Regions:
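Glycine-centered signal
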Residues: 9-10, 45-47
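Predominantly soluble domains enriched in secretory-pathway, periplasmic, or organellar proteins
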Residues: 46-421
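Compositionally biased, intrinsically disordered/low-complexity regions enriched for serine, proline
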Residues: 13, 20-21, 39, 211, ...
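N-terminal amphipathic/hydrophobic targeting modules at extreme N-termini
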Residues: 3-22
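Bacterial N-terminal signal peptides
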Residues: 29-42
Length: 421
């Protein structure tokens, strides 16, 4: 019997015998007929739970719709949309992480909102506005804690992943008490979060193994105005970009006693100074084997770096100023999108030959790319055309197109099992 029909049986148990005896025979027959109809029609909804999907979540994902404050839940196997969830606030610079069972997504909005959504029910579980202006977040190694980094008033707040109740508030102030914006928040091994203080020029690491007593380690004087950061896929290196000077600041999380080191001294040297909002995302770095591919600043180039010694080993000329440089799972290809006004184009680099092997134009304002877990397809958001497109990564053919309202970030549940994502 259909499970919803089984639930309907409980309706009979709740009707007292005295009620049946009080009914005339005809009325009693009509009432029993009505209950029988409820029993045999499984589609009748008696609870919100009855609307939820019964399926796995490993091939699900979300698409951020930045203009409407909504998110689409998508089926990446069928290449279709399952739900649209509304009421998520300002998603103009939104990002997301997933619970370790990949059922829930946590959406970090620009307005300070933290939203927990249910991917199987297509519903908003809870939303809290925890600050005035936030810029991303992370989920802990064991999936029990969600952290949010804030511009206003600064600092990091940490929440219980189940209830979204706050468990820690970590102010971001320097030694003189001046508040700082927080950027580059990531999860790290050892139940830690690592983040950067933009105004104070610090990297901080917080150990959350005992949520009641967070242990914060500070690394001062890393450089001027660190604007973004990343953690390498193995969880070892945390690297911050500097807006106020050239080069990068790197912390080896396996050997933190060595402190912060400077690498790639020429990184950041463009033909002209760029405003911080045009600086490339460091999360857009790609790792393919021991090679790291990263967007050059102010140049139409992708830099190639040997991660064994963090020395530059090559440059690849590309179509425009790179924004995201994304590695296909397996590392054979790197896909690149570009800043305005050349943001209608995507290029593909072969990581063996270090050559551009394909160039195409998905449409107006390509914002984000997300690969399927094994890399056979890539999803691309095209904001100004209001679509998400799906491409075969071998033949470079378009396989599907889904309508979306000003789509930006695309996030698949495979991220639930990867450090720093």
């Amino acid at each position: 019997m259909h499970e919803k029909g089984v639930r309907n049986l409980f309706l009979f148990e709740k009707v007292p015998d005295t009620f049946f005896r009080a009914l005339p025979c005809l009325s009693r027959a009509v009432f029993l007929l009505f209950l029988s109809v409820l029993l045999i029609i499984p589609g009748i909804n008696h609870s919100a739970e009855a609307e939820c999907l019964t399926r796995g979540t490993g091939d699900l994902g979300i698409v951020i719709e930045r203009a409407s404050g909504s998110v689409q839940v998508v089926d990446t196997t069928a290449r279709s949309s399952l739900f649209r969830i509304k009421g998520l606030g300002d998603l103009s610079h939104a990002s997301a992480v997933f619970s370790r069972d990949a059922r829930y997504a946590y959406i970090f909005g620009r307005d300070g909102g933290l939203s927990k959504i249910d991917l199987l029910c297509g519903s908003l579980v809870r939303r809290v506005v925890q600050a005035g202006n936030s810029i991303g977040g992370a989920i802990s190694q064991d999936g029990s804690l969600v952290a949010v980094s804030n511009y206003t008033p600064g600092g990091v707040k940490i929440f219980d992943a189940d209830s979204l109740e706050q468990v820690a508030d970590l102010p971001a102030s320097d030694d003189e008490g001046n508040l700082s914006k927080v950027v580059g928040l990531v999860d790290a091994p050892g139940q830690r979060f690592v983040y950067t203080l933009y105004d104070a020029g610090e990297i901080r690491s917080v150990d959350m193994r005992d949520p009641a007593r967070p242990e914060v380690q500070r690394y001062r004087d890393i450089g001027r105005l660190p604007y973004d950061a990343l953690i390498t896929p193995d969880g070892r290196y945390y690297i911050a970009g500097l807006f106020g000077e050239d080069g990068l600041a790197m912390l080896d999380l396996w050997r933190p006693q060595k402190g912060v080191q400077r690498i790639l001294d020429n990184y950041g040297k463009g033909e002209e100074s760029l405003p911080v909002y045009k600086m490339p995302h460091l999360e857009g770095w790609a790792m393919a084997g021991r090679l790291a591919f990263l967007p050059a600043v102010g140049h139409h180039e992708v830099l190639v770096v040997d991660s064994d010694n963090w020395k530059e080993v090559g440059r690849i000329a590309v179509h425009g100023q790179p924004v995201f440089v994304e590695a296909q799972p397996g590392g054979r290809q790197v896909w690149v999108n570009f800043a305005h006004p050349l943001n209608d184009t995507v290029q593909v680099i072969d990581t063996q030959s270090l050559q551009v092997i394909h160039t195409f134009k998905p449409g107006k304002a390509v914002l984000h790319m997300e690969f399927s877990p094994r890399g056979e397809v890539v999803w691309i958001s095209v904001r100004d055309d209001d679509v998400v497109q799906v491409y075969d990564t071998t033949r470079f053919t378009r396989l599907a197109e889904l309508p979306a309202e000003k789509p930006s970030g695309i996030f698949f549940t495979a991220r639930a099992h990867r450090t720093g994502l």
